[in-house]
């Protein structure tokens, strides 16, 4: 099984995602956006991506992150969108699943 598929298979409601090794999430005031910094550069995140990633601390589960987002933004039914973004972030190594 490839590393990409292994990681995607680990992504479920009980998974505990964290920012991937080699990346650092921070607020960039000059750009008014969250960014992911890595040795070769920077990724400017849209608002939704920043809100999701800043909750990925390796302690909270995906289910807890979704609940927190739904509460913070008065929304419901965010699970599929959050999971889809996290799956993409895993393939880009922005996220990793912690035990």
Which residues make up each language-model segment?
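Acidic, low-complexity/disordered tracts enriched in E/D and polar residues
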Residues: 1-54, 98-99
């Amino acid at each position: 099984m490839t590393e990409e598929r292994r990681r995607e298979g680990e992504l479920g409601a009980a998974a505990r995602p964290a920012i991937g090794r080699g990346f650092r999430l921070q607020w960039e005031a000059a750009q008014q956006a969250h960014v992911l910094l890595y040795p070769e550069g920077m990724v400017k995140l849209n608002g939704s991506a920043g809100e999701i990633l800043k909750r990925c601390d390796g302690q909270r589960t995906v289910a807890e992150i979704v609940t927190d987002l739904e509460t913070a933004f008065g929304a419901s039914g965010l699970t599929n969108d959050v999971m889809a973004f996290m799956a993409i972030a895993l393939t880009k190594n922005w996220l990793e699943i912690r035990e």
